[in-house]
């Protein structure tokens, strides 16, 4: 019984430890998501501002080489935004995987807690039965001693 409890406690400890690492990875992923969102917002605002400036300069006529530089810069901005969106998608997928693993580990930990509580209750019942047996044997012994003394008094 004790070995089972110890084994289940060890398994629970291992699950709690791995769950802790999953939570740490989730925190890292969330900080990465926040960082990428901030970068994406900066890129988008910069792109909008740059497009406004380009629109104003187009109204006043820009030379062809200068316009090509603007288009190249806008293309780089769009490429950067797309890369940031791709990393966001990857981070969200990782986040969902780790959330799934975390939920799975939580269920396991609940199961180990349940098994440990059952074993503890079973152990408590066994100790109560042992105490009751000891008490019964003690009462029986006293009764037998009492009867034995009564028998010797008459002889």
Swiss-Prot record:
The keyword Protein transport applies. It is found in: Cell membrane. It is a peripheral membrane protein. Coiled coil: none annotated. One of its GO terms (cellular component) is plasma membrane. GO terms for biological process: bacterial-type flagellum organization; chemotaxis; protein transport. Keywords: Bacterial flagellum biogenesis, Bacterial flagellum protein export, Cell membrane, Chemotaxis, Membrane, Protein transport, Transport. Gene3D superfamilies: 1.10.287.1700. The keyword Transport applies. Flagellar protein that affects chemotactic events. Belongs to the FliJ family. This is Flagellar FliJ protein. It comes from Buchnera aphidicola subsp. Baizongia pistaciae (strain Bp). The gene is fliJ.
């Amino acid at each position: 019984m004790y070995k089972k409890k110890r084994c289940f406690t060890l398994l629970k400890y291992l699950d709690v430890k791995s769950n802790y690492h999953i939570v740490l990875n989730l925190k890292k992923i969330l900080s990465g998501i926040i960082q990428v969102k901030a970068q994406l917002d900066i890129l988008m605002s910069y792109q909008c501002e740059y497009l406004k400036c380009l629109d104003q300069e187009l109204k006043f006529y820009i030379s062809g080489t200068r316009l090509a530089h603007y288009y190249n810069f806008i293309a780089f901005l769009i490429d950067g935004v797309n890369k940031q969106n791709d990393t966001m998608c990857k981070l969200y997928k990782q986040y969902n995987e780790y959330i799934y693993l975390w939920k799975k580990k939580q269920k396991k930990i609940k199961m180990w807690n349940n098994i440990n509580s059952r074993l503890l209750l079973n152990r408590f019942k066994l100790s109560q039965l042992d105490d009751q047996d000891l008490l019964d044997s003690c009462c029986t012994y006293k009764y037998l001693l009492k009867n034995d003394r009564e028998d010797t008094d008459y002889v």
